[in-house]
Amino acid sequence: ALRHRTAALALGVCFILPVHASSPKPGDFANTQARHIATFFPGRMTGTPAEMLSADYIRQQFQQMGYRSDIRTFNSRYIYTARDNRKSWHNVTGSTVIAAHEGKAPQQIIIMAHLDTYAPLSDADADANLGGLTLQGMDDNAAGLGVMLELAERLKNTPTEYGIRFVATSGEEEG
């Protein structure tokens, strides 16, 4: 009988105590996002399909969090150096993703990370496997994008004094 009462008491305590959902540890969301971006969008060089797809993915993430978000394209060019030292212009169209969080004051805080990976600027770069389609870019710069997306996730319902603009850029190596 004592054993039954103890079991009933233990079972009752289980239903009385509040259930606490475990919240993700700081950095978990950033880690998941960075790994997703690096895995599913390797070779995110400015103007490539992978760069455009990753920009759209980031825009969608911001929109799912409730931010106004859009993609703006820009044209740029850079000098590519061939093996024979001949230089030529390469034209690219890059993408920038911008998401907005309004604040009380007109001033803004800008949080930036670049979404593209390194593009080979010469045949020597390509030969040394610097950049290119296989580069996953965890440190260039999926990790920065992950941190930016976690900040956006954590701030989405927080009133702020200043507005916040999250900006994911591309083309910084090319100019």
Model regions and ranges:
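Bacterial N-terminal signal peptides that target proteins for export
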Residues: 1-9
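Active-site-proximal beta-strand/loop segments in catalytic clefts of secreted hydrolases
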Residues: 40, 72-75, 101-103, 112-116, ...
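Stable alpha-helical elements in mature extracytoplasmic
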Residues: 26-40, 50-61, 97, 141-147, ...
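A non-catalytic alpha/beta surface segment that caps or lines the substrate-entry region
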Residues: 36-102
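Bacterial N-terminal signal peptides
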Residues: 8-18
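Extracytoplasmic/secreted cell-surface and envelope-processing proteins
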Residues: 80-82, 119-122, 174-175
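Loop/turn elements at helix/coil->beta-strand transitions in domains of secreted/extracellular proteins
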Residues: 32, 65-67, 105-109, 160-165
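Acidic/histidine-rich catalytic neighborhood of metal-dependent amide-processing enzymes
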Residues: 93, 132-175
